[in-house]
UniProtKB/Swiss-Prot annotation:
This is Potassium channel toxin alpha-KTx 2.16. Disulfide bonds join C7-C29, C13-C34, C17-C36. One of its GO terms (molecular function) is toxin activity. The modification Isoleucine amide is found at I39. Belongs to the short scorpion toxin superfamily. Potassium channel inhibitor family. Alpha-KTx 02 subfamily. Has the structural arrangement of an alpha-helix connected to a beta-sheet by disulfide bonds (CSalpha/beta). The record marks Y37 as: Aromatic residue of the functional dyad.
Amino acid sequence: TIINVKCTSPKQCLKPCKDLYGPHAGEKCMNGKCKCYKI
């Protein structure tokens, strides 16, 4: 899921992704936005 959070590194996506999917969330930074996925 791509969320509307700007990023330059995946670390910036860690908290919003965990808020979305809980502790087992994965995160990437793609094209300046966070992408979250369930592991």
